[in-house]
Amino acid sequence: MASQPKSQPRNEIPSVATPSPRTLEYLRLSMVVFALADVAAHLFASPGATPIVSYWIDIETATYGLIAVVYLLGLRRYYLPPILFTAYNLVMYFVSGLVALPFGISKAPLVGHLQFAQYSFGRGFSLLPWLYLLIMGIVLLKKDPGSKLNELLDR
């Protein structure tokens, strides 16, 4: 009597270290949603909250629109610039609460917690998308192989 080969137990629980392609697609889509949430926060910010309309806000909204496209298409080779830009925005947000920055983010340093909280609906509401884009951007940079479009760009 021949012994039957024992089947290996299947690991049904997906590993966090290697996300499935479907999980990566959902992560990329969530990055798109948060990038567009950042754009919406700036576009619909109340005009009275920021005393000056600057080119920086325009640059920021356009850039996050482009960042949404990068993550939507899974262009892994371009994941690092959005991470750096988001980190820069976070730093400038907190620095602008203490120091008057020359390029239109704030005319004067903010004093007190209430003024900092009311600094700008757009800038304040952007904090959550920035944190998400920064943290998950680093995760995707390490775990996401990118889409098939990357192979096309390599040719």
Predicted regions and their residues:
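Membrane-interface extramembranous regions
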Residues: 2-155
